[in-house]
Design a protein with these regions (language model features):
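Family-specific signature for flavin-dependent thymidylate synthase
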Residues: 1-223
Length: 223
């Protein structure tokens, strides 16, 4: 299971400005990033931030994105931050994307003993009853080792937890990446055998203008 929360997308204005630098075509930009409204209480006109991508800018974005990474450098300037809670087996694959990503994670090494282990700490939704029984045996053993470590501070028990911990254990990370990285992930993973990757790619499609800019070209699956 994967959960994605607190998504923030920013950098559109700089990305569009930079995208138009090579042809000095700033005057053709039809996007705007603030709008005015009349404040009746203060009897004044005020501006508020907003993001509206114009049709001409969007058309150019789509064209440059299709032309490849060199022409689509503007995608690196559209930044995305979010919190992701996912099992360790998914993070192992996510970590193959080193360029253009930053992540701060909840530390397994430092905090593995901080709380009692429960079934909800793991991705188990596809397990049958027998496998759930096995996982619960592992959880009971993890909690025994945790209690022994808390009581004795003997590193032997900490080692037991670290080496016994299943890869279905869920970890939270706060992640920053950009549309170019997401585009690469999307086309490589959208048909992946892991449900977490398919859910991640479905989330990509909900990002502003992602389907138009990044989602309409072919991609090879590594499933």
């Amino acid at each position: 299971m994967i959960r994605i929360e607190k998504t923030d997308v920013y950098g559109w204005e700089a990305a569009i400005r930079g995208m138009r630098n090579p042809m000095n075509s700033w005057d053709k930009s039809d996007s705007y990033f603030e709008t005015e409204y009349y404040n009746f209480r203060l009897d004044s006109v005020e501006s508020v931030p907003c993001t509206h991508i114009g049709s001409d800018d969007l058309k150019l974005m789509m064209s440059l994105s299709k032309a490849g990474n060199d022409h689509g450098k503007f995608l690196r300037m559209i930044n995305v931050t979010m919190d992701i809670i996912a099992p360790l087996y998914w993070w192992k694959e996510f970590d193959t994307y080193k360029v253009g990503t930053v992540a701060n994670s909840c530390s397994t090494m430092h905090k593995i003993h901080a709380k009692e282990f429960v079934l909800g700490d793991f991705s188990w939704e596809k397990l049958d009853n027998q496998s759930i029984d096995v996982l619960e045996v592992v959880i009971n053993r993890l909690n025994y080792c945790r209690n022994e470590f808390l009581a004795t501070k003997d590193k032997k028990w900490w080692d037991q937890m670290i080496q016994l911990l299943p890869t279905s254990y869920e970890q939270k990370r706060t992640v920053q990446l950009n549309y170019q990285v997401l585009k690469s992930m999307y086309h490589a993973r959208k048909n992946h055998k892991l449900q977490e990757w398919r859910d991640f790619c479905a989330w990509c499609e909900t990002l502003p203008y992602f389907k138009e800019i990044c989602g309409d070209e072919g991609g090879e699956s590594d499933a």
